[in-house]
Amino acid sequence: MVSQEQIEAIGGVLNNKDRPLKERFRALFTLKNIGGKTAIDAISKAFDDDSALLKHELAYCLGQMQDPTALEILTKVLKDTTQEPMVRHEAAEAMGAIGHADVLAILEEYKKDPVVEVAETCAIALDRVRWLQSGQQVADNNPYASVDPSPPTAGDKSVAELKAIYLDAKQTLFDRYRAMFSLRNLCTEESVLAIAEGLKDSSALFRHEVAFVLGQLQEPCSIPYLQENLEDHKENEMVRHECAEALGAIATDDCIQILTRYADDEKRVVKESCVIALDMCEYENSPEFQYADGLSKLDGTK
C-alpha cells in the first residue's frame, strides 16, 4: 500500500521545475500507476508548467487512469485556448478515454474548434463515448495496457481489407483508427508496414497516432518511416514528438543515433521528446525493473 505521504512526495518531484524532465516523467508515470484522487490532484497541479510536452503527457496519463475525478481538470484544459494545441488535443482524447456520458456536450461544442487537431480529436472522442454507450461488444485483442481512442474493427478482416479502410480519407477518423488498431493487434511485419504508410496522411492528428502505435509495436522495420517524419522540419511538431518517442521505445542503436542528433532541435517539444526518448532507450536496454520508478527513487532502492 502506498501512503499519502509517498504519493505527495512523488507529486513533489513531478511539480518541481528544477528537476530534470526525465525524472518528472518517471514520477508522472508512477502516479498514473498508483491512481486515486491524491495522484490526480498532483498531476493536475502541473498544468501550469511551461513544457507543452509535459502537459500533454499529464493529460494522456489522466485519460489512461479512466477516473472520472479527472474530468473537471481535463475540461478546463480543453477550454483554455492559451494551452498549446497538443495539450488541448490530449485533454479531449483523455475525456474520450474516460468515456463518461457527461463529456458529450463539451466534446460536441469543441468539435467545431478552429484548431484542427482539437476539433478532430473531439469528433473521435465523441464517437468513442457514443460507441461505449451503444453497448456494442467487439473482441479486443489489445496486447498493450492502453486505453485506445477507438475499439478495433469488428469481424475478421485481412491486412489488405483493413489497410484499405485505414488509408481511405473518405472514411471517418474513428473508423480509420479502428482499422489501425486491428492492424496493430495483428502485429505482423505486413501489418506494421501498412500502419507506417499512414505517416504520409494529410491529417497531422492521424500521423501522430500512427507514430504512437508504431512505438507500441516496437518493430525495427518502422524505423526509416519514423526517422523520415522526425527529420522533416516542416512536419507538425506534435507528429515529430511522437516519432521521437516511438524511436525511444524501439531503442536500437540506430534509434539512439537518430535521437541524439535531434536532442538539440530548435523546436522545444521535439528537443524534449528526444531527451525523454533517450531516457526510454536507456531503460529498454537496462536491467531496470520498471520505467515508472518514482517509489523506488523515494526510498533509495533501484
From Swiss-Prot:
Its cofactor is Fe(2+). It is a peripheral membrane protein. Binds 2 Fe(2+) ions per subunit. It is found in: Endoplasmic reticulum membrane. The keyword Oxidoreductase applies. Fe cation 1 binds at residues 56-57, 89-90. It comes from the Eukaryota. Keywords: Endoplasmic reticulum, Hypusine biosynthesis, Iron, Membrane, Metal-binding, Monooxygenase, Oxidoreductase, Repeat. HEAT-like PBS-type repeats lie at residues 23-49, 54-80, 87-113, 175-201, 206-232, 239-265. GO terms for molecular function: deoxyhypusine monooxygenase activity; metal ion binding. The keyword Transmembrane does not apply. Its EC number is 1.14.99.29. It catalyses: [eIF5A protein]-deoxyhypusine + AH2 + O2 = [eIF5A protein]-hypusine + A + H2O. It is an enzyme of class 1 (oxidoreductase). Fe cation 2 binds at residues 208-209, 241-242. GO terms for cellular component: extrinsic component of endoplasmic reticulum membrane. Pathway: Protein modification; eIF5A hypusination. GO terms for biological process: peptidyl-lysine modification to peptidyl-hypusine. Belongs to the deoxyhypusine hydroxylase family. Catalyzes the hydroxylation of the N(6)-(4-aminobutyl)-L-lysine intermediate to form hypusine, an essential post-translational modification only found in mature eIF-5A factor. Essential for organismal viability and plays a role in a wide number of important processes such as cell growth and proliferation, and regulates induction of autophagy and protein synthesis. Has a role in eIF-5A-mediated translational control. This is Deoxyhypusine hydroxylase. The gene is nero.
